[in-house]
A protein has these predicted regions:
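Conserved N-terminal structural module of periplasmic/extracytoplasmic solute-binding proteins
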Residues: 22-115, 120, 132-133, 363, ...
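Hinge/lid segment of periplasmic solute-binding proteins
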Residues: 41-46, 109-164, 321
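Extracytoplasmic/periplasmic substrate-recognition and gating elements
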Residues: 71, 176, 298-371
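A structural signal for short loop-to-beta-strand junctions that line the ligand-binding cleft
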Residues: 95-96, 103-104, 135-172, 323-324, ...
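Short, solvent-exposed loop/beta-turn-alpha elements that line the ligand-binding surface or hinge
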Residues: 127-139, 183, 209-213, 229-254, ...
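Extracytoplasmic/periplasmic solute-binding protein
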Residues: 154-158, 191-244
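Conserved C-terminal helix/tail region of periplasmic/extracytoplasmic solute-binding proteins
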Residues: 174, 392-441
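Glycine-centered hinge/linker elements that transmit conformational signals in sensory
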Residues: 194, 238-277
């Protein structure tokens, strides 16, 4: 199989997401029959007392769900997972690898990082753990291809998210006569809705792009959603990924300025200022629309926002007290976390087998905030209509693209994150910001 290029990442995942949702019919619980038991201990021997060192993207909010997913494996095997999670985990993985101390398992979002590590011969083929047939038999072919580098299968995708979701309180909208947007709505419709809400003396938006070492990525998510839904947005998005279109293109500048139109217009944001936007953690920014009384009307963030909202406000009912409508234009970006290993030790392979199973992934799906790409986990497993709707959006979006900065990875990704933060603070420096991003290509 040929090497997976950055442009093929985009094309392959677009096909993969569609294939995955088409496979999710009614759950007859037979889809996972080809997998090993969720405990994953088959063939591992005695691994009790051993700890598997895992680096991943999930922080404190998502960690309890990951731990719930892993607990059956720990109970069955007597082994444990030693997990370190942070949003900037790609840099930590790189540092550990370059320092000669790689983790046993890594679960980042950056497909570009995975591809680079595999091409350098740093990763362990899944066949060394006896997992290749299992992955090929239970995951859509396009996802299998995306985890394959130079003909060798190194990784599998465990969790997917759409990022075409704007979160709101349906009751607040109904009380004020505001209409949620649809996939057919335009950017102008979103601006008009923003103006209408602002005129009611409620801040239309809550926006926070703080995220520790990776601050700025929520702003990048806004911008790539805008790019995809512009006129000829798919062509522009694809060109930015494969490098045929520079970041200094006037259409890219327009997309950033559209983000600024929302974030930097006085009265639009509950955080009150550019400094407030940069200082507010992205998780905390999901709260204001659902406070009593609400401090904002809307928050843009991927489908995983449902987890933060539900944890902060456990009495809210999905679909009644919080829901989402599609980003104007209907096109959706999204991402998926890839799982790969640096060794084939028995405990490492046993944990991989568990994480790859339908039974294990169904645990997190049922808890919420998780979309599985395993063909044995159906839409019926999702806990409510809001969660099912987020999974369904991956199929219904008129266009879908893999998260742009995750696909680019490395220095360019960090320049985009830093650029988003700088733009919020100093919008008059946009030309310089875009030139700096382009200089990393």
């Amino acid at each position: 199989m040929p090497v997976i290029t950055r442009s093929r990442i985009l094309i392959t995942l677009t096909i993969a997401i569609t294939s995955f949702v088409l496979s999710c019919g009614d759950d007859d619980d037979d889809g996972g029959a080809a997998t090993q038991p969720a405990g994953g201990a088959t063939g591992a021997g005695d691994i009790s007392g051993q700890a598997v060192d895992v680096l991943g993207i999930w922080g404190a909010d998502e960690l309890p769900n990951l731990e719930a997913m892993v607990k059956p494996w720990e109970d069955e095997t007597g082994a444990s997972m030693d997990f370190t999670g942070q949003r900037g985990v790609g840099a930590l993985i790189t540092s550990r690898v370059e320092g000669g101390n790689p983790p046993d398992v890594a679960i980042p979002a950056e497909v570009g990082l995975f591809q680079d590590l595999a091409s350098e011969g740093r990763l362990t083929p899944l066949s060394d753990c006896g997992l290749e047939d299992e992955i090929r038999g239970n995951y859509p072919e396009a996802f299998v291809n995306l985890g394959t580098v130079d003909g060798t299968l190194y990784g599998f995708f465990m969790k997917a998210d759409t990022k075409g979701t704007i979160w709101y309180n349906p009751k607040t909208f109904e009380e004020n006569g505001w209409e949620p947007l649809t996939a057919d709505s335009t950017w102008e419709d979103l601006v008009a809705l923003t103006d209408e809400i602002r005129d009611s003396d409620l801040a239309p938006w809550s926006i926070g792009i703080g995220s520790e070492a990776d601050s700025g990525w929520p702003g990048s998510d806004w911008i790539q959603q805008i790019i995809l839904n512009m006129d000829d947005g798919e062509e522009l998005y694809d060109g930015l990924l494969d490098g045929s279109i520079p970041y200094t293109d006037p259409r890219v500048k327009e997309a950033w300025e559209r983000f600024g139109e929302i974030a930097l217009t006085e009265g639009n944001v509950s955080q009150g200022s550019s400094a407030g936007i940069n200082a507010t953690d992205f998780r905390v920014a999901t709260y204001p629309p659902f406070e009593t009384p609400p401090a904002a009307a809307m928050n843009y963030l991927g489908a995983f926002a449902a987890l933060f909202i539900a944890e902060q406000f456990p009495d809210l009912v999905p679909g009644e007290d919080f829901d989402f409508f599609p980003f104007p234009g209907g096109g959706a970006t999204g991402g998926s976390n890839i799982v790969f290993a640096f060794n084939s030790d028995p405990a490492t392979c046993s944990l991989l087998r568990h994480l790859a199973s339908a039974d294990a992934q169904r645990i997190w799906v049922e808890l919420g905030g998780f979309t599985s790409v395993h063909t044995g986990v159906s839409l019926d497993a999702y806990p409510n209509e809001t969660a099912r709707g987020a999974a369904q959006q991956l199929l219904e979006a008129p266009s879908f693209r893999f998260d742009l900065d995750d696909a680019l990875g490395g220095e360019t990704q960090q320049a985009i994150f830093a650029g988003a933060t700088e733009y919020i603070a100093n919008p008059n420096q946009l030309d310089s910001i875009l030139s700096n991003i382009q200089a990393t290509r």
